[in-house]
Swiss-Prot record:
Cofactor: how and how many bound: Binds 1 zinc ion per subunit.
Single GO MF descriptor: class I DNA-(apurinic or apyrimidinic site) endonuclease activity
Family in the record: Belongs to the FPG family.
Zinc finger regions, FPG-type: 240-274
Residues annotated as transmembrane: none
The protein's name in its UniProt record: Formamidopyrimidine-DNA glycosylase
Pfam family, one: H2TH
Length: 274
């Protein structure tokens, strides 16, 4: 699943390809992707005639800003966007097509059909699901060691489960939680409430640093992720633990182990993390 760095990279590469373009038609081939309004015809009708004014990101969600409305898109596991000429044939697994007046199209493909789309009036979008439930952005001042500590002391969950909770901090998934915990020297299965104030500060610092570095490197391509221009990310070459089961730790040489924490495959170094 694309996490914050991958979605941010998609946002940056997609924005110049669609900004200023006016929607002439919307074709929907898999209605289950449409979540609000549930009626696909109503979903399409309200966007026709509107111009793309911007593209933002909130956590793992893309937020397309139109004249009056905002389209909220979650890519889930395999969703991706591409811009192509209307004359080019559709690729397999294309489920939604936004046709522009200039003859180009924004095409949404999703092999697994898990993605979702919501349309709301712009002024309502942040107050409605799915955005309303999200916690602070990790690179914003709203996410501080104090905020993290407050949530940690109130839960019986593991620290990994806490960081995967999108109401705590928006945009972290399996890759960047594992990497942040390794860099902070904290075992993923530790109770979040057991972390000391120094560990909380170190974890916060490494979360911010890890996400920031991953954004600069265009995200991680560990399976199928590519940006809007078909380019792979580069942060996978900087991964310390994720996807490296059995390989030597880059810091101490101990083989990286894999277990299950919070229902997710979890990579860690049994020597570097406590």
């Amino acid at each position: 699943m694309p996490e914050l760095p991958e979605v941010e990279t998609i946002r940056r590469t997609l924005l110049p390809l669609i900004v200023g373009k006016t929607i002439e038609d919307v074709r929907i081939f898999w209605p289950n992707i449409i979540r609000h309004p549930r009626d696909p015809e109503a979903f399409a009708a309200r966007m026709i005639g509107q111009t793309v004014r911007g593209l933002e990101r909130r956590g793992k969600f893309l937020k397309f800003l139109l004249d009056r409305d905002a389209l909220i898109s979650h890519l889930r596991m395999e969703g991706r966007y591409a811009v192509a000429s209307a004359l080019e044939p559709l690729e397999p697994h294309t489920h939604v097509v936004f046709c522009f007046t200039d003859g180009s199209e924004l095409r949404y493909r999703d092999v697994r059909k898990f993605g979702t789309m919501h349309v709301y009036a712009k002024e309502e979008a942040d107050r409605r699901p799915p955005l309303a439930e999200l916690g602070p952005e990790p690179l914003s001042p709203a996410f501080s060691p104090a905020v993290l500590a407050e949530r940690a002391v109130k839960t019986k969950r593991s620290v990994k489960a806490l960081l995967l909770d999108q109401t705590v901090v928006a945009g972290f998934g399996n890759i960047y939680v594992d990497e942040s915990l390794f860099r902070a020297g904290i075992l993923p299965g530790r109770p979040a409430a057991s972390l000391s104030s120094k560990e909380i500060e170190r974890l916060h610092e490494e979360m911010v640093a890890t996400i920031g570095e991953a954004v600069m490197k265009g995200g991680s391509t560990v399976r199928t992720y590519v940006n809007t221009q078909g380019e792979a990310g580069a942060f996978q070459h900087s991964l310390f633990v994720y996807g490296r089961k059995g390989e030597p730790c880059k810091r101490c040489g101990t083989p990286i182990e894999k277990t299950v924490v919070a229902g997710r495959g979890t990579h860690y170094c049994p020597r570097c993390q406590r």
